[in-house]
Amino acid sequence: MNREAIFHNPVSNYAFPISYEKFKVRLRAGKGDLDRVTLVIGNKYLWHTRKEVPMEVEGSDELFDYYSYVYPVDDPRVAYYFLLEKGDEQWLYGDSGFAKPELVNVDEDESSAFVNFHFPFINRIDIHKKPSWVNSAVFYQIFPERFCNGNPKLSPENVAPWGTAPDRQIFMGGDLPGITQKLSYLEELGVNALYLTPIFEATSNHKYDTVDYTRIDPHFGDESDLVELINQAHKRGIRVILDGVFNHCGGGFRQFQDVVEHGEESPFRDWFYIREFPVSFDPLNFDSFGDTPYAPRHPGLKNLSEEQLRTACMPKWNTENPQAKEYLLGAVAKWTRMGIDGWRLDVATEVDSHFWREFRETVRGINPDALIIGEFWRNSEAWLQGDQYDGVMNYGVQRAAVEYFAKSAVAPQRFQEILTENLMRYSDAANDSMLNLLDSHDTARFLTVSGGNTARLKNAAAFLFTFVGMPCTYYGTEIGMTGENDPDCRKAFDWEESHWNTDLRTHYQKLMRLRKTRKALQEGTVRFRSQGDLFVMERQLQVELLVTVINNTDCPQNYTLSGNYVRDLLSEKAFEGAQNATVVEVPPFSAMILEK
C-alpha cells in the first residue's frame, strides 16, 4: 500500500458540511492503489452508534484517486476514521496517522494507540451558503464600452465609429442604455445573469481605473440608467452582477491626487502604499496595479507627460486603513442597496482577507442571496471557505478547455484529470459557484485560438454548459466574434445580423435552454468516463442521467451505452440498440448530450 499518497484533512475541502443535514468526507489515495476504503463515522459522544460505509471513487487525476461519501448528519459532532484495504493488507487511518487494526480498540473514540478525525461541531454560520440561484445561472459577460451605444449623447468627444479596430485609448460609445435596449436579445438567447465589467467613473475605456466609486461613469449614464437596467433585467428574470475594483484605483482618484499634492501632510497618505515622499512617477515610488506595467518606462506610456502619468498609474489601495475601508465598503453598500445581485472582484488575490470578510458581511447583510466572485487565475482554496467569496473566475478550467478543445494539445484522459484536480480543490458549494468561461476581456477569444474553427467552439460550449459551475459566455462569442489578446478581444459587438454565425448562435441557445431546464445539469453528480479519443462526462441526479460525449478529432468515433434507446438532446436524433446496448457514432468534431 502506498501510504505516502494517502491524505485527509478535517475542516477543509476534504471534510465539509454541504448543509446542516449532510456532511461530505473525501480521502486521497494513490491512483489504482487501494481495493477498498471504508469510512467509520458517527457521533463522537455516542461512538458506539458509529456506522461503517463504503466510499466510492469520486474522481481521479494523474496521480491520485479521490474517494468520497456524503454522511446524513443526525448530530453536528462528527468523529471518523478510514479502513484502508489492499489485498490482505489493512490499515486504519485517523488523526494520529496509521495503525494496524489488531492494535487498536476501535470501540473507543480515542485511545493511546489511535485518535480519530474530528469535525468538532457543524455550526450553521460556518456552512458555505451559496446563493439559491447559482445552480441554474447562465451568465453573459459584457464589456459595456463595446456592447451597444444606446444614447449617443453620452459618448465622449471624438468617439470612434462603432466597429473601429480597438486599442487601449479609443472610445466607441457603449453605455448602460445600450445594454437595457438589448435585454430582449439576451433573453431570447437564454441568458439569466449578466456580469458587467466596471461601470464607475474612470478615465479609460475599460474603467478598471476608478476615480469615483460612488458615481456611474458619465459616458455610461447615471444612477437612473443603472436602476432602469436592473429593473428591466429583473422583469425578464435576468440578474445583474457588477465588477468591483478594490485592489487599486485610478491615478485621477481625488484622494490620491491629494497625496500627490500634499505628500505627508495629506490626510489620505495611508490610504495607499507610498514608499517615500514626495510621490514620484519616474521612478515609481508607490505600489500600483502590476507595478511595472503601469510605470512610466512602459512602452505604452513613455510619451506621456507627468500630468498624464498621474492618471495613467493605478495606485494600490491600503485596505487595512480604517478610513479607506469605510469609503470602499460605503460604496459597496450603496450599489448593493440599489438592487444588484452580486459582485465580481478584480485582482482579488492581492487584497487582504480581512477586507473580504467585511465585504461579504456588508453585501450579505443587505442581500443575503447576493453572489460574490473573485478574479483568480490559480488555486483559490483559501478564499473559498464560505467566509469570503462564493466562487472565482475559473481560469484553471478555462486554460484546460482551450488546450483540449481549441488546440488538441492534450488527450481526453488528461483533460478529465485536470478537471478532477480542480474539482477536488474545493467544496461542492464552491464548485457550484465557479464562473466557468472559455474567453474573457483578459484573454484571446476562443475562435481566434482555434484558428476560426467553429466546430471546436461548439464542442467547448457543449462541455461548458454541462460541467459543474456557472457557464459564462463572453459577449459576441455566440455569434462568432474573434480577437487576439487585449485590446483586440474588446471589439465592438457587431449588431448587423447578416454578419452573425447563426448556426453557432442556435447552438448556444439550445445549450442555454438545456442548462436552465435539466436538473441533472444543475445539481447532478459529475463522473468522467472518457475512452479512447472521446471525452465523456456523466451528470446524474437521482434517475436522470445525461451523458456529454465529445469527439474532438477529425475521425468518427463510436460510443456504447447500456440500454436499447438513446436520444441526443442537441440534434434530437434517436438511436436504437439491442441486447441492452446502443452504439452511437459521434461524427468528427461534434458533441452529443445523450439521454437514455
Where do the language-model regions lie?
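Glycan-association/targeting regions that enable binding to alpha-glucans and other polysaccharides
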Residues: 1-135
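Carbohydrate-binding surface patches
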Residues: 14, 24-26, 528-562
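Conserved, mostly hydrophobic/aromatic
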Residues: 27, 142, 186, 196, ...
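C-terminal beta-strand-rich structural cap/linker in extracellular carbohydrate-active enzymes
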Residues: 31, 578-596
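Hydrophobic faces of well-ordered beta-strands that scaffold small-molecule active sites
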Residues: 138-140, 194-196, 240-242, 343, ...
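Substrate-binding/active-site clefts of carbohydrate-active enzymes
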Residues: 139, 143-192, 199-337, 359, ...
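Aromatic/acidic polysaccharide-binding cleft in carbohydrate-active enzymes
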Residues: 145, 386-390, 432-455, 459-500
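Active-site-proximal helices and loops of the catalytic beta/alpha 8
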Residues: 230-238, 247-248, 253-264, 331-333, ...
